[in-house]
A protein has these predicted regions:
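Charged, low-complexity intrinsically disordered terminal segments
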Residues: 1-119, 129-141, 146-223
């Protein structure tokens, strides 16, 4: 009991280097930035914005998610991605290995998307009998980047609990939509793209697809 009473009285002070990193000047500027932000709180709007972004893509799409399912909203996203791929848009899909194995390998829409030449699927830490001790190493990222111009980032997974109005069993969450007006020079956009590339290049990410049209690579679980 005494520990609980007196422990809050001790507060370790950050060292000078760390305190310098937390200065307000590191996060603010006197000049206007070139990125515009919109908060998205509604689940139906969250799905619509994802579909709008994917539909508007001309060059590239990056979609990273923890839990993508082949339910109503997930199928909407997969159909939109397939349509974008048909137009020649380069697509990179980064998904966590557990939910990919549970919910996607039997999806025809996912199989069709993964088989396209201009689509790469990266699976983070695929389920593997030899990697049982790394089973809890999961990726919870959730964002979409389109044409190096805009991104949507937040806490929503890619399924009916978080997107659309297909079910009454919903989760309350929020996304931030960021549009860059500086031709790809927006700082937060660049940081997110650099972060994605860092994760994409991790050894635990198994990448399938791209210019390889071997149908055996469509199933992206780890052998």
């Amino acid at each position: 009991m005494l520990v609980n009473v007196f422990a809050p009285l001790y507060c370790r002070k950050p060292d000078e280097k760390f305190a310098e990193m937390l200065k307000q000047t590191e996060f603010t500027s006197d000049t206007p930035g070139g990125e515009r932000i919109r908060c998205i709180d509604d689940n139906e709007e969250a799905l619509l914005w994802r579909l709008r972004m994917i539909g508007a893509a001309k060059k590239s799409i990056v979609l990273a998610t923890f839990d993508l399912r082949a339910d109503e909203s997930g199928t909407d996203l997969l159909a939109a991605l397939n349509h974008a791929a048909e137009k020649g848009v380069e697509i990179k899909l980064l998904i966590d290995g557990i939910y990919q194995q549970l919910f996607l390998n039997g999806s025809k829409e996912f199989q069709a998307l993964a088989a396209r030449e201009n689509v790469e699927v990266g699976v983070y830490n695929p389920v593997s009998p030899v990697g049982i001790f790394k089973l809890n190493y999961r990726m919870h990222d959730k964002y979409v980047i389109v044409d190096d111009k805009m991104y949507l980032l937040g806490g929503r997974n890619s399924n009916d609990i978080f997107l659309g109005d297909y079910t009454t069993d919903v989760n309350v969450d929020r996304d931030i939509l960021v549009c860059d007006t500086t031709n790809g020079k927006g700082e937060s956009l660049q940081e997110l793209e650099a972060y994605f590339q860092q994760i994409w290049n991790e050894d635990c990410v198994k990448i399938k697809g791209g210019r390889k049209k071997n149908s055996s690579e469509i199933s992206v679980s780890e052998e």
